[in-house]
């Protein structure tokens, strides 16, 4: 009998608990492979792992050649089993690593003291404020300024099926149980059997969906995380803040909630024809129903807990008056009234539940009248309970028990759960406005007008009370959809103003790009322009939503400040800003900018745009919030959220921030409650530091003009290198040959097409940034996360060696520069050019000039980064990540070699044989995504 799958990670710099977990899971996986596929299959899995490990550790590429030779001769069934085995291995290792993160955080918490709190915790931030002389009032004022809004999206970067995600969560729970509990021998035996069975089910579960998820599927997936881990994590964050204030200031005080969630799932229409107005309505109402149902559950628990008898705890007068009013307005079943006639607190909770039940009935049956009861009234009822408990001398129960948790939930999630954004491309609004103006007889060829005339015309129509669409006129399907979308928004905000918050305009280039959707909103009664009834002069605007420009390309980012200057200077738009309380949100796109200009240019253009946009808003006296459209990978603005906050320009730190949580990032950050809590506390820590301690995000004191000139030069050099690669005549042909981009475009992982034209017509311009990055990650080049910086840094240091000390100083003291270089290092360590060379040689007829260009820039980047950071090897500052990548590489290499073989067979085989090979190729894409812990 063969031994279980050998992992051999002890003594390699990995902690003993992680080593034990990985070896346990690997051993069980080996047993399951042997049981399901036989000892020969397990031997093949182990042989390939050993060969690739020897090739990596001993720098002996001939061992990798031997591995590929064996894969080349493998049967289809053998290739399929290799993919299943190695993919399952990475699913298991990823859970073990998450448990290791949780273990380390718990260990640090146990070792922490009030004087030395856990790093990146809320305690650490509050202590830092105290040490810098901030008073309690200062800290409370700072908390009042905080406005943190994570935004979940359905971007197509989560390759795993929900069935796989649920099994991973179950395995994580068992690993946690094993780590935390002292199990009896019988319990340990049961747990190992359960783990074995879960791994068996994992191996037997299809990795690839049979068909694309629908938008409703995506909504339900997002809501799963919101109503489970996020729902549980948010009250813990507020309790952390209260505890820190008690610990360091001796104060038990209330503060305004600062953390709220937003969502695009079910409302992001840009490029997704399946997000219809009906879907958006269904999404919002589903969220409302779920919020009300969760509150009913919370209230049942609270009612069970507050078993206070009026005979022992006399109800205050305020509670008695409230119950009398409730009795007039809410009808409760007689048995409930009898049951709680001497338990006033429970009776009050029952009346609250009765009101929520009425709201749920009205959702299910619109003919039923809904109670006049909103989230604010719900919060006030909970506050009444809190005051009455305090009046009874039960202050701890009032302020440090289940009621406080429910109050936080109500203030955070309201009756809307999460606020939706609607997003649409600017060209869609342009076409709809052109059609309406033509039908109204106002302008036959709006699209031919210059921008100045467009603005004049739009301003005239926005101030004109009559609608554009003549009675009975028929419009195109596209225009009907746009108008219906605004009508749905109007309907939803009338039900609850928090259901929809923003209308985001993709590819905002001009002032008219924002005026056009305002005109469409006016057409359905969502936007109102009102003159002063006495003088007839311009009065004011009424509008319940924000209009948000989205700047995405390098050109748009470089021009963002001047465009925002023009937008805020427009008299009608300025009235829109006034209608929103003098507030303007601005969104920045991290994905298209990197695809457009490369890693360094995109990062610098985004940094400068933030700085300049903040200055424009401040100059106009406008309160602003920047919305960061970050992806999960470094090539799309990913990385640790708290480091990204610290790296932002100091001028933007006004306490407000939004950022997207996309695709696989959602399941990584929110699948486990402890990981979700850690993610959120790091964000709050960073926001407290940058707003309360401005030096936290400062620079080394270099003259800004000098700094900007040097960074502009580096960005321009980097972009030239990047564009020289991707603009080369044969580049697109090479890229489509050596990467599985064609299969990625068909991968059924999201409702949205990968191309802006169609999923079957892919070229560079229409290809979205997500599959662009996804494909580079699969073949281990990862160029969106680093390429171009080699030429930029090397040329600068060659021509101006005196700048080396400047760059070293920046790395030590400028968070932005340090973060950009550290993120690039991480991607370079994860890149594996020796594996990429196989794709180039066997699929691209290489070695090609493209591979040589990439390899040369890699080595130039590595040399320059090591000189600037004074390291011996990349990621010396983060040896745990470096070691994790090194340990993963041999296993990932096997997946890459199998994928390579499948791509060769698809291209050389008969059409009749290609479909099963394509299915296997989909599985290889999932496997490598699991190994790399990222897609696009």
Curated annotation (Swiss-Prot):
Temperature dependence: Optimum temperature is 75 degrees Celsius.
Listed InterPro entries: PEP_COase, PEP_COase_bac/pln-type, PEP_COase_Lys_AS, PEPCASE_His_AS, Pyrv/PenolPyrv_kinase-like_dom
Enzyme Commission (EC) number: 4.1.1.31
GO CC terms in record: cytosol
Catalytic residues as annotated in Swiss-Prot or TrEMBL: 155, 595
pH dependence: Optimum pH is 8.0.
Regulation of activity: Exhibits positive allosteric property with acetyl-CoA and fructose 1,6-bisphosphate, and a negative one with L-aspartate and L-malate.
Cofactor entry: Mg(2+); Mn(2+)
Name of a matching Pfam family: PEPcase
Record keywords: Allosteric enzyme, Carbon dioxide fixation, Lyase, Magnesium, Manganese
Family of the protein in this entry: Belongs to the PEPCase type 1 family.
Subunit comment: Homotetramer.
NCBIfam families named among the record's database cross-references: PRK00009.1 (NF000584)
Protein name: Phosphoenolpyruvate carboxylase
Source organism per UniProt: Rhodothermus marinus (Rhodothermus obamensis)
Source lineage: Bacteria, Pseudomonadati, Rhodothermota, Rhodothermia, Rhodothermales
């Amino acid at each position: 009998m063969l031994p279980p799958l050998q992992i051999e990670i002890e003594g390699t710099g990995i902690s003993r608990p992680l080593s034990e977990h990985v070896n346990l899971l690997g051993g069980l996986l080996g047993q399951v492979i042997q049981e399901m596929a036989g000892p020969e299959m397990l031997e093949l899995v182990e042989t390939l792992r050993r060969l690739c490990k020897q090739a990596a550790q001993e720098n002996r590429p001939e061992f990798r050649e031997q591995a590929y030779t064996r894969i080349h001769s493998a049967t289809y069934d053998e290739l399929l089993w290799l993919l299943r085995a190695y993919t399952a291995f990475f699913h298991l290792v990823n859970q073990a690593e998450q448990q290791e993160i949780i273990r380390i955080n718990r260990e640090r918490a146990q070792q922490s003291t009030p004087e030395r709190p856990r790093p990146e915790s809320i305690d650490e931030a509050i202590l830092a404020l105290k040490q810098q002389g901030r008073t309690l009032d200062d800290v409370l004022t700072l908390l009042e300024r905080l406005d943190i809004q994570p935004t979940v999206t359905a971007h197509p970067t989560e390759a795993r099926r929900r069935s796989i995600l649920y099994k991973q969560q179950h395995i994580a729970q068992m690993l946690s149980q094993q780590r935390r509990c002292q199990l009896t021998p019988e319990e340990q035996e049961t747990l190992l059997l359960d783990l074995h069975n879960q791994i068996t089910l994992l191996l037997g579960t299809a990795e690839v969906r049979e068909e694309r998820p629908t938008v409703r599927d995506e909504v339900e997936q997002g809501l799963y995380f919101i109503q489970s881990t996020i729902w549980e994590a948010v009250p813990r964050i507020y309790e952390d803040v209260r505890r820190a204030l008690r610990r360091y200031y001796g104060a038990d005080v209330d503060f305004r909630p600062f953390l709220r969630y937003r969502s695009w799932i079910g409302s992001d229409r840009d490029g997704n024809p399946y997000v219809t107005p009906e879907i958006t309505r269904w999404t919002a109402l589903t969220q409302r129903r779920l919020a009300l149902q969760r509150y009913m559950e919370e209230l049942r628990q609270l009612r069970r807990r507050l078993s206070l008898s009026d005979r022992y705890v006399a109800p205050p007068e305020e509670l008695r008056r409230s119950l009398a009013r409730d009795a007039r307005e809410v009808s409760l079943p007689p048995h409930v009234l009898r049951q709680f006639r001497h338990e006033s607190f429970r009776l009050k909770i029952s009346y609250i539940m009765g009101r929520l039940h009425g709201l749920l009935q009205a959702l299910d049956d619109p003919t039923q009248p809904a109670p006049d009861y909103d989230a604010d009234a719900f919060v006030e009822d909970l506050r009444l309970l809190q005051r009455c408990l305090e009046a009874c001398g039960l202050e701890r129960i009032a302020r440090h028990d289940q009621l406080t948790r429910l109050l936080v939930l109500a203030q955070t999630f309201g009756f809307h759960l999460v606020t939706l954004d609607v997003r649409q491309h600017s060209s869609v609004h342009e076409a709809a406005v052109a059609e309406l103006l033509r039908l109204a007889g106002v302008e036959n060829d709006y699209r031919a007008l210059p921008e100045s005339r467009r603005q004049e015309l739009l301003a005239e129509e926005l101030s004109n009370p009559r609608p554009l669409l003549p009675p009975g006129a028929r419009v195109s399907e596209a225009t009907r959809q746009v108008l219906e979308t605004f009508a749905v928004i109007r309907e939803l905000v009338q039900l609850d103003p928090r259901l929809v918050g923003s209308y985001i305009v993709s590819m905002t280039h001009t002032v008219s790009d924002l005026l056009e959707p305002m005109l469409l909103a006016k057409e359905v009664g969502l936007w109102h322009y009102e003159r002063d009834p006495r003088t007839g002069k311009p009065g004011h605007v009424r509008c319940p939503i924000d209009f948000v420009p989205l700047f995405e390309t390098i050109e748009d980012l470089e021009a963002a400040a001047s465009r925002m200057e023009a937008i805020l200077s427009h008299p009608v738009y300025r009235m829109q800003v006034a209608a929103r309380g003098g507030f303007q949100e601005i969104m920045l796109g991290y994905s298209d900018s990197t695809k457009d200009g490369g890693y360094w240019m995109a990062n610098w253009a985004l940094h400068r745009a933030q700085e300049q946009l903040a200055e424009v808003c401040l100059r106009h006296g406008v309160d602003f919030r920047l919305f960061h459209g970050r992806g999960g990978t470094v090539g799309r603005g990913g990385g640790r959220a708290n480091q990204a906050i610290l790296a932002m320009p100091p001028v933007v730190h006004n306490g407000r921030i939004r950022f997207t949580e996309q695709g696989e990032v959602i399941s990584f950050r929110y699948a486990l409650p402890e990981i979700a809590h850690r993610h959120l506390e790091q964000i709050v820590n960073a926001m407290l530091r940058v707003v309360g301690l401005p030096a936290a995000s400062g620079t080394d004191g270099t003259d800004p003009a000098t700094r900007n000139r040097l960074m502009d030069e580096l960005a321009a050099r980097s972009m030239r290198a990047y564009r020289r690669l991707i603009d080369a005549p044969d580049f697109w042909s090479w890229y489509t040959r050596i990467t599985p981009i064609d299969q990625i475009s068909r991968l059924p992982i999201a409702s949205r097409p990968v191309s802006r034209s169609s999923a079957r017509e892919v070229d560079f311009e229409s290809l979205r940034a997500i599959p662009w990055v996804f494909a580079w990650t699969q073949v281990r080049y990862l160029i969106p996360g680093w390429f171009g910086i080699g030429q930029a840094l090397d040329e600068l240091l060659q021509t101006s060696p005196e700048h080396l000390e400047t760059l070293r100083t920046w790395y030590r003291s400028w968070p932005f520069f340090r973060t950009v270089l550290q993120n690039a290092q991480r991607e370079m360590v994860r890149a594996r050019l020796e594996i990429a060379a196989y794709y180039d040689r066997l699929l691209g007829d290489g070695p090609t000039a493209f591979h040589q260009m990439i390899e040369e820039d890699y080595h130039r980047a590595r040399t320059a980064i090591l000189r600037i950071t004074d390291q011996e090897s990349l990621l010396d500052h983060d040896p745990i990540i470096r070691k994790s990548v090194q340990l993963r590489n041999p296993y990932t290499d096997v997946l890459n070699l199998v994928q390579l073989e499948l791509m060769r067979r698809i291209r050389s085989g008969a059409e009749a044989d290609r479909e099963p090979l394509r299915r296997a190729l989909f599985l290889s894409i999932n496997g490598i995504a699991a190994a790399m812990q990222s897609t696009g």
